[in-house]
Amino acid sequence: MSGRGKGAKAKGKAKSRSSRAGLQFPVGRVHRFLRKGNYANRVGAGAPVYLAAVLEYLAAEILELAGNAARDNKKTRIIPRHLQLAIRNDEELNKLLGGVTIAQGGVLPNIQAVLLPKKTGSKSSK
């Protein structure tokens, strides 16, 4: 007798909660951080899955835009400058990360309109 009861089946291979949810970010680690961080006495089973999905989405969004910024600068490696350009040129990300300073990020190029040279009028026809 195997000791599993009548209709119980063998467990099989362990499957992580991240792979069950189709995520790359670690659901188990996020759950541990939620428990250890004293955010609440109890943490539901769905909360770390949802939070890991949100974090993964934000990371993918920022990396996508930073990759585009790197390609625009003819570079193959993303540096902090590319992250800065990606975040500051995106309205929603800039609002979310408005108070964040990115080390070695630099500033956005910006010239006030009044400082630009005056445009010459079109040539008058005779």
UniProtKB/Swiss-Prot annotation:
Q: Which InterPro entries match?
A: Histone-fold (IPR009072), Histone_H2A (IPR002119), Histone_H2A/H2B/H3 (IPR007125), Histone_H2A_C (IPR032454), Histone_H2A_CS (IPR032458)
Kindly give the Pfam families that the UniProt entry links to this protein: Histone, Histone_H2A_C
Q: Which residues carry this modification: N-acetylserine?
A: S2
What are the protein's GO molecular function terms?
DNA binding; protein heterodimerization activity; structural constituent of chromatin
- Renumbered residue ranges of the record's region Disordered: 1-21
User: What does the PTM comment of the record read?
Assistant: Monoubiquitination of Lys-119 gives a specific tag for epigenetic transcriptional repression.
Position(s) of the covalent cross-link Glycyl lysine isopeptide (Lys-Gly) (interchain with G-Cter in ubiquitin)?
Answer: K119
Q: Which residues carry this modification: N5-methylglutamine?
A: Q104
- Entry's localization field: Nucleus; Chromosome
Q: Which PROSITE patterns match?
A: HISTONE_H2A
Give a GO cellular-component term.
nucleus
Ranges of biased composition (kind: Basic residues): 1-18
UniProt keywords (A-Z) are: Acetylation, Chromosome, DNA-binding, Isopeptide bond, Methylation, Nucleosome core, Nucleus, Phosphoprotein, Ubl conjugation
What is the top-level taxon of the source organism? Answer: Eukaryota
Matching entries from Gene3D superfamilies are given as: Histone, subunit A (1.10.20.10)
**ATP-binding as a keyword?**
no
Task: According to the UniProt record, list the residues that bear Phosphoserine.
Answer: S2
Q: How does it assemble?
A: The nucleosome is a histone octamer containing two molecules each of H2A, H2B, H3 and H4 assembled in one H3-H4 heterotetramer and two H2A-H2B heterodimers. The octamer wraps approximately 147 bp of DNA.
Q: What family is this? A: Belongs to the histone H2A family.
Report the protein's function: Core component of nucleosome. Nucleosomes wrap and compact DNA into chromatin, limiting DNA accessibility to the cellular machineries which require DNA as a template. Histones thereby play a central role in transcription regulation, DNA repair, DNA replication and chromosomal stability. DNA accessibility is regulated via a complex set of post-translational modifications of histones, also called histone code, and nucleosome remodeling.
Entry protein name? Late histone H2A.3, gonadal
What lineage is this protein's organism placed in?
Eukaryota, Metazoa, Echinodermata, Eleutherozoa, Echinozoa
